[in-house]
């Protein structure tokens, strides 16, 4: 049995294959996932697992150098936005690097998901609970 934090074989596999600047999406239950994207569906029911639970596990395993978030989260889900910023601040301290935060429109965000190595769908049912993680290097 794998000793690391990620037990899901699909998530573990995609993270291990990421190269520098490759992207990985963690999304809510409602984000449309392009047919061309590898879909890893973790959703069990509404809210399970939560966006932050999935993101926490993924970022424990993945080196992150930048993130892309929909601008709309600031207005339509400010509590999650603050939680997300706190998580990214803690991740920066843990990794020892600065994580660039980029904002884009939700429409542009959806288009960019097609370029990601995979889209991990959570059970989150709150608006704009989506993030694109850009892989960094550990050296």
From Swiss-Prot:
Give binding positions for substrate. 28, 106, 128-130
User: Principal localization?
Assistant: cytoplasm
- EC main class here is isomerase
Q: Which Pfam families match?
A: RbsD_FucU
Q: Which catalytic reaction applies to this protein?
A: beta-D-ribopyranose = beta-D-ribofuranose
Question: What UniProt keywords apply to this chain's record, in alphabetical order?
Answer: Carbohydrate metabolism, Cytoplasm, Isomerase
**UniProt-listed InterPro entries:** D-ribose_pyranase, RbsD-like_sf, RbsD_FucU
Where in or outside the cell it occurs: the entry states:
Cytoplasm
GO CC term, one of those recorded: cytosol
Q: Coiled coil located at which positions? A: none
The entry lists its GO molecular-function terms as: D-ribose pyranase activity; intramolecular lyase activity; monosaccharide binding
Q: Which residues form the active site?
A: 20
Tell me the route in metabolism or biology where this protein functions.
Answer: Carbohydrate metabolism; D-ribose degradation; D-ribose 5-phosphate from beta-D-ribopyranose: step 1/2
What's an example Gene Ontology biological process for this entry?
A: D-ribose catabolic process
EC number in record: 5.4.99.62
Please describe the quaternary structure of this protein: Homodecamer.
- Which PANTHER family does the record match to this protein? D-RIBOSE PYRANASE
Biological function:
Catalyzes the interconversion of beta-pyran and beta-furan forms of D-ribose.
Per the record, the similarity remark reads: Belongs to the RbsD / FucU family. RbsD subfamily.
Full protein name:
D-ribose pyranase
UniProt organism field: Escherichia coli O81 (strain ED1a)
